[in-house]
Amino acid sequence: LKCHKLVPPFWKTCPEGKNLCYKMYMVATPMLPVKRGCINVCPKDSALVKYMCCNTNKCN
């Protein structure tokens, strides 16, 4: 699995066990990702931060 880094088109190959791509962004600024990368479990959203997770190549 390959996930985008913070600035596409750059990407990295995920290590074993991290089989989700994720994008983290502030609720107030959904078009500006704060973090991107590989993760093993999608974190829960909070009042300020949201996560978008997916399990296909470079979908974040």
Curated annotation (Swiss-Prot):
One function term, GO molecular function aspect: toxin activity
Summary of the tissues where the protein is detected: Expressed by the venom gland.
Keyword check for Secreted: yes
UniProt keyword list: Cardiotoxin, Cytolysis, Disulfide bond, Membrane, Secreted, Target cell membrane, Target membrane, Toxin
Protein task: Shows cytolytic activity on many different cells by forming pore in lipid membranes. In vivo, increases heart rate or kills the animal by cardiac arrest. In addition, it binds to heparin with high affinity, interacts with Kv channel-interacting protein 1 (KCNIP1) in a calcium-independent manner, and binds to integrin alpha-V/beta-3 (ITGAV/ITGB3) with moderate affinity.
Annotated disulfide bonds: C3-C21, C14-C38, C42-C53, C54-C59
Main localisation: secreted
InterPro entries referenced in this protein's UniProt entry, alphabetically: Cytotoxin_Cobra, Snake_3FTx, Snake_toxin-like_sf, Snake_toxin_con_site, Toxin_cobra-type
Keyword flag Secreted: yes
Entry coiled-coil feature ranges: none
Pfam families reported in the protein's UniProt record: Toxin_cobra-type (PF21947)
SUPFAM superfamilies in the cross-refs: Snake toxin-like
Family, per entry: Belongs to the three-finger toxin family. Short-chain subfamily. Type IA cytotoxin sub-subfamily.
Subcellular location: Secreted; Target cell membrane
Cited Gene3D superfamilies: CD59
GO BP term, pick one: killing of cells of another organism
Record note on quaternary structure: Monomer in solution; Homodimer and oligomer in the presence of negatively charged lipids forming a pore with a size ranging between 20 and 30 Angstroms.
Name of the protein: Cytotoxin 7
